[in-house]
Amino acid sequence: MQIDISLVKQLRDATFAPLGDCKNALVEANGDLELAQEILRKKGIAKAGKKADRETNEGLIKTHNDGIRTYVVKLLCETDFVAKNDSFLGLFDKIFDVLKTVSGDVESQDDLPADVVEKINNLIAEGIATTGENLKLGGVHVTGSKVYAYSHPGDKVVSLVYHNGDDNVAKELALQIAALNPDYLSFDEVPADEKAKLEAQFTEELKAAGKPENMIANIVKGKVDKAFADNVLLEQEYIRDGGKKVKEILPAGFEITKFYRFSV
């Protein structure tokens, strides 16, 4: 049957599928736009299954704020070429739209309802059919809390700072997190077993070196703190002034409650 070119363009705009695939799907669907979308979706799922084992070492991370909540989506692909492709980039807005239907905060994709996961998986399957590469959802985050979101140029690193103060200060922290990738906010967050392992190691070393028993505990504490300092945000050297620790740049009353860092 003859398919109107305007229908082909509509389907292309909705799915990002190649024009030839759009035309064939419309022919198969007898011009029914919704049915043609479903045909493309099913073909995408079939292609997705064949590509599922291929490694996805490239991708991008995008953020979005709708005035109510902040959204982060990490989407992975096989090559940097596809990461710059309009079809790949268009998936982010579609996934953001799906995430807007979720109530409450989301720390990771494990928190997503099953129906939302299915919708996102269908979008990714369509993306696989369009780009010809394996695509995967690498992470999501949704929050209605006060956060500062920083996207490093190139969209390969994003950091989120949950805070109750000045956004300019939060921005400095977000830059610090993006650059130096700490695991913990403060020494209090370092797991007790990790501390205990180092304490035991340093204690044995100091005893073997003949240090007085009454001095060992204080020396061990200092050595343990120093060992973890590079991995604790508040104890790191401030990237703009190595003579200061991050905690020393925080104004009175400023509080950071937690942070996240996403990277490709």
Question: Which residues does each PLM region occupy?
Answer:
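N-terminal assembly/interaction segments in proteins that build large macromolecular machines
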Residues: 2-264
